[in-house]
UniProtKB/Swiss-Prot annotation:
Transmembrane feature ranges: none
Family statement: Belongs to the bacterial ribosomal protein bL36 family.
Pfam families with a match to the protein in the record: Ribosomal_L36
GO terms of biological process kind: translation
NCBIfam families: rpmJ_bact
Organism: Mycolicibacterium smegmatis (strain ATCC 700084 / mc(2)155) (Mycobacterium smegmatis)
GO cellular component: cytoplasm; ribonucleoprotein complex; ribosome
Gene Ontology MF terms in the entry: structural constituent of ribosome
Protein name: Large ribosomal subunit protein bL36
Lineage of producing organism: Bacteria, Bacillati, Actinomycetota, Actinomycetes, Mycobacteriales
Annotated PANTHER family: 50S RIBOSOMAL PROTEIN L36, CHLOROPLASTIC (PTHR42888), LARGE RIBOSOMAL SUBUNIT PROTEIN BL36C (PTHR42888:SF1)
Cystine pairs: none
Highest taxon above the source species: Bacteria
Amino acid sequence: MKVNPSVKPICDKCRVIRRHGRVMVICSDPRHKQRQG
């Protein structure tokens, strides 16, 4: 899980979602998981 000021989709399977007011990227590749913070 990377914590970045700006989250961007890396590949085609990356999805940008909002959970509890946080912007997150979920993907089938676990290395692409990101959270804004």
